[in-house]
């Protein structure tokens, strides 16, 4: 069987994959078959880690908010803060609250103290009505 020389389309496809893998070390950056396998692995990892990154950032924000709230001194924890925020219909997401905890902690304290005052006032009002 005679050898068929491939045209420019196959060469263009291979050079495109080589540009994708130009920074990889060893055979993974030089050999076409190894590049293709490693590219599939890289796409899989990037897809998996995009969802993992969302999860990790959410955990980080929750940890920062909880640490800042516990420093406040009043008996408040993260879950109660979020519950009371939703009860008051203050829809501040966790990313915004974490930024407040880092950059402007006094503002976060004011928000949490105001919410706690309102909750205490309403609970005492319901006790008096009964």
Curated annotation (Swiss-Prot):
Tree of life domain: Eukaryota
Biological processes per GO annotation: ribosomal large subunit assembly; translation
Residue ranges crossing the lipid bilayer per the database entry: none
One Gene Ontology molecular-function label: rRNA binding
Keywords annotated in UniProt: Chloroplast, Plastid, Ribonucleoprotein, Ribosomal protein, RNA-binding, rRNA-binding
Alphabetical list of InterPro entries matching this protein: Ribosomal_bL20, RIBOSOMAL_L20_CS, Ribosomal_protein_bL20_C
Regions annotated as coiled coil: none
Subcellular location: Plastid, Chloroplast
One Pfam match: Ribosomal_L20
Chief localization: plastid
One Gene Ontology cellular component annotation held by this UniProt entry: ribonucleoprotein complex
Family statement drawn from the similarity comment of this UniProt entry: Belongs to the bacterial ribosomal protein bL20 family.
Functional note: Binds directly to 23S ribosomal RNA and is necessary for the in vitro assembly process of the 50S ribosomal subunit. It is not involved in the protein synthesizing functions of that subunit.
NCBIfam families in alphabetical order: rplT_bact
Name of the protein described by the UniProt record: Large ribosomal subunit protein bL20c
Lineage: Eukaryota, Viridiplantae, Streptophyta, Embryophyta, Tracheophyta
């Amino acid at each position: 069987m005679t050898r068929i020389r491939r045209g420019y389309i196959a060469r263009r496809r291979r050079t495109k994959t080589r540009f994708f893998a130009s920074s990889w070390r060893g055979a993974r950056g030089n050999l076409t078959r190894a590049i293709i396998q490693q590219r599939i692995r890289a796409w899989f990892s990037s897809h998996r880690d995009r969802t993992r990154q969302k999860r990790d950032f959410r955990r980080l924000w929750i940890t920062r908010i909880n640490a800042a709230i516990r420093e406040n001194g009043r008996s408040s924890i993260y879950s109660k803060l979020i519950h009371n925020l939703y009860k008051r219909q203050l829809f501040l997401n966790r990313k915004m609250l974490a930024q407040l905890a880092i950059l402007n902690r006094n503002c976060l304290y004011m928000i949490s103290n105001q919410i706690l005052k309102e909750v205490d006032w309403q609970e005492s009002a319901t006790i008096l009505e009964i």
